[in-house]
Amino acid sequence: MIFVVYLNHLSQLLYDAFSYNTSTNALSFEQQPKSMINMLLLVEDQSFFKHPGVDFKEIIRVVRDYIFYDKPLRGASTITMQLIKNTLLNRERSLGRKVKEALMALLLEHSFDKKFILNRYINTVYLGQKGNISINGFTNATRFYFNKKLALLSLEEMAMLVALVKGPDYYHPVRHSLRLLKRKQLVLSIYQKFEKIVK
């Protein structure tokens, strides 16, 4: 009974957070460049359109490593889980937080379709900082870093933005330019291999 009440509480939180659009610069899924979507999925979540919001094998691996090998609770986050974490949860790394993240991801995918979730992620993911203003979403990041529209980005520029998803501070374009360059090259390499297979 308590668990059902808790699930209802989480469902209400999700509805309140995702049932309306808060960004004036948000693009529809159809407006997002397909190359960028493919690049993002290849690097961040290759099974996005197959899993129910949670990659159970990865979750089990991370929990096992945490319990038996004292490793930090890192990885195993699908795009859906990342969206939950970025929108509703704090940066705390605990087993309880990971379980809550997974539960909310399952509920979110039950309530909204995959394209909605992916598009919300693309429009809101944190990609940098300008003073006190955070740069959220690929549209805003494109304007900030390249002063152009998202549709006009080159593959190299898309790869840079996708590289930043992993950590805009760690891969800061000015302070850690070499680190970002290596990450960008990895993103491009993964994408180009995919393109060869498709062709």
Task: Annotate each predicted stretch with a short phrase.
Residues 1-199:
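Juxtamembrane regions of bacterial inner-membrane/periplasmic proteins
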